[in-house]
Amino acid sequence: MKKDRIIKSSHYGHRPWWFRVLNRAWRSAGKAGFKPDLSKDSLIRAARKSTGLTDLGKDFMDEPLDRLLWSIREEARLHPVGAFITRQRMINLLAARLRAEEMFRKNHGILDRPLLPAWVILGLQRTGTTKLHRLLAADESNRVLLSWEAINPVPLEIRNSKLETWNLEPETRHLERETRNPKQDKRVAIAKKSENALRLMAPGFFAIHPVEHNAPEEDILLLDITFLSTTPEATMNVPSYAAWLETTDQGPAYEYMVKLLKLLQWQRPGKRWILKSPHHLEFINLIDKHFDDVHFFWTHREVTECIPSFISMAAHSRVIFSDEAADGNTIARHWIRKTGYMLRKGLEYRTNNQHKNQFTDIYYDGLVGNSAGILTGIYSLDGGMTPELLEKFSRAEKNNPMRKYGIHEYRLEDFGVRKEDILNETVDYRNFIKNRIRDISR
């Protein structure tokens, strides 16, 4: 993709010609009775068949999956390609859970070990979270979740005969070929195919948000395995599910996420986890509850810049799954309200827990203009910066420049909303920034 390619928010409804043709052909086939089955029984049956396993775990909950599937079937109005992708994604999530439960059953030592300390990057979408995440990943002692691991956190080949012989000690590189050499891991190949498919279906999406198979990825994808996650509302029109999610205890999702992180660090240890997702803004209390040693990095950017950028990103994501449901104004109003809600939840936790000294605040402009200063401030929490680390961070930044895949231009008027709509939803947050935030590099 050319670096000077311009992707505009007004172009979110555009799709490649072959994508439109495929959908038309598939719709014709659908009239003849060939449609992806999005019923729970069909999805679980397919996952069990693909893995040869049956146990989803004693803590598996039916309600989140039931509510999500109902909302998808009744509200999302998926086009045929979107329905196919969704079915395969659901089967993969269930299969990952089946494999995880088998791993836990055969290897009790996985869950007995403590979770690594964690640095958690949170903040609204488009505030520099991805940049900071990828910079910190350049420190090899940090344990990051790579995209191929996020898609398939559990090894694919877990035949019982192999499980019996795996060593429980992480220091001895306990796994067989699949995780010992990532280049030979089938999960890497699967993630590469997913990356290529996204490039074909949405050629301009990488200019908005690159999704690379071997790059750090958001750990919200681990929460997806519990079907308690905001990923669906970021990619589909599922208002009933989204509303239910806001009133539902997310504790079980974070409890299971900790299990998966322990499984992942058992496969590949590290000094600390570097986790990242805007989703966590709503649930800082749960991270504090389920993580023993955690520090939060809250990224900040002018809300009238970051929120319109994310609205454009969400709209471009939506058309991968649906034609009819890609209403820009509906998407914009949902996410303006939602981001205001996320910020209020995050501020509520901070206000009630000021004594814990858990937060470092990072401004977008400082991160973009002086990343070395920001990183030096971060590493003051861990013994200080070294010249070797600075060189690694500098190299990582050069390899991942802004606008690497093109230029993203966005305007609120493309979605029928006003700047005042954003300002009205973010009053408390903007006052907090004005009165309290100091850039750690100063």
How should these model regions be labeled?
Residues 122-124, 274-278, 364:
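Short His-Asn-centered micro-motif
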Residues 1-102, 236-254, 261-265, 310-361, ...:
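PAPS-dependent sulfotransferases, especially Golgi type II membrane carbohydrate sulfotransferases
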Residues 252, 280-286, 304-307, 368-371:
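Flexible loop/turn segments at secondary-structure boundaries
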Residues 138-148:
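Post-Walker A helix-loop "phosphate-sensing" segment adjacent to the P-loop in P-loop NTPases
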Residues 102-112:
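Pre-Walker A adenine-sensing motif
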Residues 120-140:
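Glycine-rich phosphate-binding P-loop
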Residues 276, 287-312:
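Conserved phosphate-donor/acceptor-positioning beta-strand/loop module used by diverse small-molecule
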Residues 149-273:
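PAPS-dependent sulfation machinery
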